[in-house]
Amino acid sequence: MAFSRFYLLTALYTGGILASSAYGIPSNYPEHHHRLIERLKKNSTQDSDSSPSESSPHPRQEPRRHVLTPVHNVLKDRPCDEGLSISKLLHSIEKETNSQISVDFTILPQWFYPKKAALATVDEKQPTWQFYISPNVSWQLYNSPTAGVGSIDFSYTLIRYWRNSAQNANNAAGIAGGINDYSSRTNTLSQLTFSQTFPGDILTVAMGQYSLYSIDGTLYDNDQQSGFISYALSQNASATYSLGSVGAYVQFTPTPSINIQAGFQDAYNIVGTSFDVYNLTKNKYNFYGYFSWAPQCKLGNGQYSALIYSTRKVPQQPTQTTGWSLNFGQHLGEKLYVFGRWNGATGTAINLNRSYVLGLASANPINRNSQDLLGAACSISKVNPKVVTEKRIRKYETVIETFATIGFGPHISLTPDLQIYIHPALRPDKRSAKVYGVRANFSA
């Protein structure tokens, strides 16, 4: 508790000295997908829905004549005056530190069939209960015509299971993919970077810990907390890059519709559990290149992107790989969004080495709540026979998933979800496997 209080006061103090009136994430590239940006944007939309009169920038309550003025202003807002309100407290901190903050907490029970593995005699416990917490922060340190924009971005993923794990459910259902994005207990520092955007908004240099998962995808097939849930539809199913590793990248944005990146990372930190700079001295690096085009047309905005990467052989992942991912997402009018992905990887790092995705989504289809969302998609994945070595397996596995997110106010939503696996790869004795789930999401 003492540490938390110290951290909060330090952030308020530093923000009061360095901050200006704009956020750390550029607002002039809205269609280039980034998981952190989407989460913060979603939180900002919810705040404007709940408090329309507060959607414009807030004037400071008191001129900053003292280093503790930001702390005084937060307390003056009385965020807990009518009971504990985390969203109001975070909103007050955002105003005074010139930052964007979001915290998403998801509870996901899932039921599955078949209930037991092929050679098992006892049914697996149902449902699996997944608890997913993800805090995200973008903090702009400075913004000036001569120095440009400097910001710190942070994202963390914490996964816990109760009663049973998704890994056991995967084994029982006989699927080579997964019933969700994280099949077991996880602690991942997805992002902790400092970025410098030079005047003109054309060149950005970033250094720190980051993951390619943040840019590899489109609006609804890249985040289990807000879009599709199954492994093959919530991320790149053949990805062999790190969940988070230290490195650096350069971003070139000649026009708002074009985004080009190239970078490197330490090859040793595969799961991103720590921020380890020492590994950079071991001289093994992963490299990537990324291109995104976000055109604007009469039908609606879209994004078309290509990612290519290579990873080195290290003890934590003892195979060298080369991978690629082609993505598209296109708005067709105000309510319909279509998307697709083709991705693959060489080597023996993962069960699936090819995946093909096609789907559609409709946000707020009846103008009831900004969180309302309907989605349906299909993924066909090719099983990697060098990794899945059982005698009897299927070469391909198909999952069809549909869900409906129902918003309750600005911060709570429920999402019934259905996944049907046609010809599960590891259960040739079964024609299909089914997974039912209800995602409860609480955001602040």
Curated annotation (Swiss-Prot):
Record's keyword terms, sorted:
Amino-acid transport, Cell outer membrane, Ion transport, Membrane, Porin, Signal, Transmembrane, Transmembrane beta strand, Transport, Virulence
Tell me a GO biological process for this protein: monoatomic ion transport
Say if the entry is tagged with keyword GTP-binding: no
- Give residue spans, biased composition: Low complexity: 46-56
Membrane-related topology note: Multi-pass membrane protein
Signal peptide region: 1-19
Pfam families membership: OprB
MF term (GO), any: porin activity
The listed locations are: Cell outer membrane
Q: Which Gene3D superfamilies match?
A: Carbohydrate-selective porin OprB
* The keyword Kinase belongs to this UniProt entry's keyword annotation: no
May I have one GO cellular component term? pore complex
**Where are the stretches annotated Disordered?**
42-68
Q: Which protein family is it in?
A: Belongs to the OprB family.
What is this protein's function?
Facilitates L-arginine uptake, as part of the AaxABC system. The arginine uptake by the bacterium in the macrophage may be a virulence factor against the host innate immune response.
Provide the protein name: Porin AaxA
Organism the protein comes from: Chlamydia felis (strain Fe/C-56)
